A protein has these predicted regions:
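Cap/insert and terminal regions of metallo-dependent hydrolase folds
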Residues: 110-186
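Active-site metal-binding motif and surrounding structural segment of the metallo-beta-lactamase
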Residues: 1-37
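Short, well-ordered alpha-helix to beta-strand connector turns
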Residues: 7, 56, 119-120
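Core dinuclear metal-dependent hydrolase active-site scaffold
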Residues: 1-2, 63-121
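Active-site environment of divalent metal-dependent phosphoester hydrolases
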Residues: 16-20, 43-44, 84-85, 108-110, ...
Length: 186
């Protein structure tokens, strides 16, 4: 790991609780860290969750398709399709390294595809196994939400997409946002 004194920011993709639950307590402990998200995302998380309005003190407003700096990194937020408030993926550059972060997306949009194809390092969700979701205990409305274009990517869609974009310039792929109920790391 790296010392927390070197961390300069938290990039929020959207306002769902699994992404923002501990952000305020974290920045209260590490006061030098900024919270980077769009103003709409910040308003959504303050409206939807019992997080202190003091989070605004740490907010660094960003706008999609406009590069911004976080320490030695240049980052850019871009549109992804999901059912949160003003969802974003991130394209992060540090020297020759290009990192795309795409979690919580129901399908690969044109903008997400554009940035993921440029990445040397890719974080992409493989949220659920379709058979496990279908056989699982979630109510039908939740299963439909997860499967929708504004929901999550299933393993087969993620695998097919990765096979399509793979090149020698892609150094590492990190599968993330795996459902604990509808997926396995295998």
């Amino acid at each position: 790991g790296i010392p927390m004194e070197r961390v300069r920011g938290i990039l929020l993709t959207h306002d769902h609780s699994d992404h923002v639950r501990f952000v305020y307590s974290f920045v209260r402990k590490y006061r030098h860290i900024g919270v980077y998200c769009t103003p709409r995302t910040l308003n959504g998380l303050l409206r939807r969750h019992s997080i202190s309005n003091r989070l605004k003190d740490y907010h660094r407003a960003i706008y999609k398709e406009h590069p911004f700096r976080v320490g030695n990194f240049t980052a850019l937020a871009f549109e992804v399709l999901h059912d949160g408030t003003d969802n974003a993926g991130f394209f992060i550059t540090h020297g020759p390294h290009h990192i795309a972060v795409c979690t919580d997306l129901g399908c690969v949009s044109e903008r997400a595809d554009f940035y993921m194809r440029q990445a040397n390092y890719l974080m992409i969700e493989a949220n659920y196994d379709a058979a496990m979701l279908a056989a699982g205990s979630y109510p039908e409305y939740l299963k439909a939400r997860i499967r929708s274009d504004n929901g999550h990517l299933d393993n087969c869609i993620t695998a097919a997409y990765l096979a399509e974009i793979y090149s020698d310039s892609l150094k590492n792929i990190f599968l993330c946002h795996l459902s604990k109920d509808n997926n396995t790391p295998e």
